[in-house]
Design a protein with these regions (language model features):
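Transmembrane beta-strands of outer-membrane beta-barrel pores
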Residues: 42, 55-59, 85-89, 116-118, ...
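Short acidic/polar hinge/loop motifs at secondary-structure boundaries
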Residues: 1-22, 110
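Repeated loop/turn-to-beta-strand initiation elements of outer-membrane beta-barrel proteins
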Residues: 49, 76-79, 89, 120-125, ...
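Surface-exposed extracellular loop regions of Gram-negative outer-membrane beta-barrel proteins
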Residues: 1, 76-95, 107, 133, 144-146, 182-190, 194, 279-284, ...
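Short strand-turn segments of transmembrane beta-barrel domains in outer membranes
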Residues: 6-8, 24-27, 37, 41-71
């Protein structure tokens, strides 16, 4: 339900790196991607600095504060606490069209991360807890939410979102086979949004669970790798547009296999596929192909092809 807000729910100071995939995504990551994927890697507790403070202010009344606390709990456990707050307090209409250039906003975002790392037995794990509260108001410059909501005096909108996330990731690298690993990911979140756009009201509560088990190894040598595994998704939507009820449940279970060839020089190939069973879409297969070739040092040719299947969430994805 948060697709329309993209990375605005992930503060920039939390991000260690961003990976962008163009074209059909990896079969490992699900059956939906066809035009690309964005993955954000958050700063890890191990290796982070003990304290970080960042403050930002601009002439258009956008203010932001970021604070990171990092501590080593033991030889194998580390923890980080990320605090983020931002607000926009003043109205602006630089182009004089009668509407706000940017929404009035207020956000509180808290993340607590724990990392376990045991080099002796090859075990690493992450536990994440996050709470988000986000409020936005937009519309005409003269809109007053206390006076004009539910009327035709001035057009306005409010979007109030509360979100809770819990995720875990456990990885194991086989001690005598460093190229062989096993990973298990779980994520649970509750997204609760109350909003209105003019005279139209839109409320949605989404409860989601995602689980992914993946095994990585090689075939003969490290130029030939493969990944295989299982995953399960569950989404419960309690969605209302005015008095219309669009509540539903989506769940799926799937299996995937992906082969990678990489000569560590000028050519790599990823060939994969998955089979999934969805409670509303049925059983289907989604193949994926990626190829990369360097004909010379400063040139890269890429090719990707694949099939995807997706259950659209048309109201949440097309919010103003």
């Amino acid at each position: 339900a948060s697709q329309a807000y993209g990375l605005s729910f992930t503060p920039g100071t939390w991000v260690e790196s961003i990976q962008i995939t163009k074209g059909a995504g990896s079969a490992v990551n699900g059956y939906e991607s066809i035009s690309g994927q964005i993955n954000t890697e958050l700063i890890k507790p191990i290796g982070d600095i003990p304290f970080f403070l960042n403050a930002y202010g601009s002439t258009d009344s956008r203010f932001e504060l970021n604070t990171h606390f990092n501590t080593k709990l033991s030889d194998k456990w580390s923890s980080s606490l990320f605090l983020h707050g931002n607000t926009r307090v003043a109205k602006s209409d630089m182009n004089n069209d009668g509407f706000l250039d940017n929404p009035l906003a207020k956000q509180i975002n808290v993340l607590n991360r724990y990392q376990y790392y045991n080099e002796e037995n090859g075990l690493v794990s992450f536990i994440n807890f996050r709470y988000l509260n986000d409020e936005k108001q937009t519309g005409e410059l003269d809109f007053d939410k206390n006076r004009d909501r539910g009327t035709t005096n001035n057009w306005g909108s409010e979007i109030n979102t509360e979100r809770l996330d819990l995720s875990t990731k456990v990885g194991y690298v086989f001690k005598d086979l460093p190229y062989q690993s096993l990973g298990f990911q779980n994520a649970f979140n509750i997204h609760n949004q109350h909003s209105y756009f003019g005279l139209n009201q839109y409320n949605i509560k989404q409860s989601s669970y995602y689980s992914n088990l993946i095994f990585n190894s090689i075939i003969s040598n490290t130029m030939n790798k493969f990944a295989t595994g299982l995953n399960f998704t569950y989404d419960k939507y309690q969605e209302f547009v005015n008095v219309n009820d669009y509540s539903r449940i989506d769940n799926s279970v799937g299996a995937f296999f992906e082969y990678t060839y990489d000569n560590d020089d000028d050519f790599s190939l990823i060939l994969g596929g998955r089979i999934d069973n969805h409670n509303r879409l049925g059983t289907f297969v989604t193949p994926r192909l990626h190829a990369r070739y360097n004909p010379w040092e400063k040139a890269v040719l890429r090719f990707s092809a694949g099939r995807r299947k997706r259950s659209a969430n048309i109201n949440a994805e097309n919010q103003p």
